[in-house]
């Protein structure tokens, strides 16, 4: 089973809101998920409170066991919006 850390779209038309979830890569984007690790609201300006909230401890755990982040989740990590620590540190 290949596991991905991806965004699950919620909200209304033209007012998106996303959950950051861990799910099997074979499941559709808005289908079943293993764990909910955070949220992302693109309607809030970048860097302000409420823009992005991810449980860094759980994200580090899932990355440590081999979960692959999608492009957007990787971008959040690279830009420093989420501080990822090595598992067990």
UniProtKB/Swiss-Prot annotation:
Any one GO CC term of the record: small ribosomal subunit
One GO BP annotation of this record: translation
Molecular function as annotated in GO: structural constituent of ribosome
Assigned keywords, A-Z: Ribonucleoprotein, Ribosomal protein
Top-level taxon of origin: Bacteria
InterPro entries, per database record: Ribosomal_bS16, Ribosomal_bS16_dom_sf
Family indicated by similarity: Belongs to the bacterial ribosomal protein bS16 family.
Protein name in the entry: Small ribosomal subunit protein bS16
Protein's organism: Anaplasma marginale (strain Florida)
Lineage: Bacteria, Pseudomonadati, Pseudomonadota, Alphaproteobacteria, Rickettsiales
Gene coding for it: rpsP
């Amino acid at each position: 089973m290949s596991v991905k850390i991806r965004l699950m779209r919620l909200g209304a038309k033209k007012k998106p809101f996303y959950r950051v979830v861990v799910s099997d890569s074979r499941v559709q984007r808005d289908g079943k998920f293993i764990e909910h690790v955070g949220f992302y609201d693109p309607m809030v300006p970048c860097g302000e409170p409420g823009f992005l909230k991810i449980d860094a401890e759980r994200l580090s755990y899932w990355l440590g066991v081999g979960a692959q982040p999608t492009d957007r989740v990787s971008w959040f990590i690279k830009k420093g919006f989420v501080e990822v620590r090595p598992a067990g540190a």
